Amino acid sequence: MNKKILNFIKKKNKTKIISLTAYSKNIASIIDRHCDLVLVGDSLGSVLYSFSSTKKVTLDMMIEHSKSVRMGVKKSLMVVDMPHNTYRNSKEALSNAKKIISKTKCDAIKLEGGKKVIQIIKTLIKNKIPVMGHLGVLPQSATNFKFKGKEIAERKIILRDSKLLEDAGVFSIVLECVESSLAKEITKTVKVPTIGIGASVHCDGQVLVTDDLIGLNKIKARFVKRYSNIEKQINDAALKFKKDVIRSKFPTKKHSY
């Protein structure tokens, strides 16, 4: 395990871990100043391409966006999602993970699931590919996005899977839409950092989709807090530009050759 990953793990129980998503160099270079982890999430499918789910996201999409993000990330740990149907077995997962790592120079990959993907995770880690786990709501296979952990049987499975992921060697676990007390229990139980998204304040850190954070997405999930309204700022700038062009106030001599 490399030094960057080890330093990330050491943050558990010491300081809250900050994570946001990025799909381009420009956004990555801004959030890198404030993040411990920058995630190139397959959420880019819905955020950038208006896909109804992440299932349509391809490996090539992830690689190209990650290459752009890599140019903007200098400080943070950079993690890339393995998209749907790219890790159906150990052989496929290893081939695609190697491709992601070699072409994007990212620090680690993330994949979804518990018991079903344990052998795949072990294979990747055996081949020195750092893996981040993901439990709770799993967008690549979810039929609904209701929070997880309300029922006792479901709680037991998620808790079991968190221990299995830790034993398999993941360096961190994302908990998505997990009931508060369960997220707290998992965070206390496992020795690796938990990163919550809709999983309460009890996790070791938090992650949000940056476009949600800055107010670019129309749909707002319960777990999202908007810290800015970039949509309004873009709208205002475009309107001012339009008015200047119509009134022949742009370009001026200052902006001409």
From Swiss-Prot:
Residues annotated to bind Mg(2+): D42, D81, E112
Cellular compartments annotated: Cytoplasm
Key word Metal-binding present: yes
Catalysed transformations (reactions): 3-methyl-2-oxobutanoate + (6R)-5,10-methylene-5,6,7,8-tetrahydrofolate + H2O = 2-dehydropantoate + (6S)-5,6,7,8-tetrahydrofolate
GO biological process assignments: pantothenate biosynthetic process
Keyword terms, alphabetized: Cytoplasm, Magnesium, Metal-binding, Pantothenate biosynthesis, Transferase
UniProt keyword Magnesium, yes or no: yes
Gene Ontology molecular-function annotations: 3-methyl-2-oxobutanoate hydroxymethyltransferase activity; magnesium ion binding
Assembly behavior: Homodecamer; pentamer of dimers.
Protein name: 3-methyl-2-oxobutanoate hydroxymethyltransferase
Organism of origin: Pelagibacter ubique (strain HTCC1062)
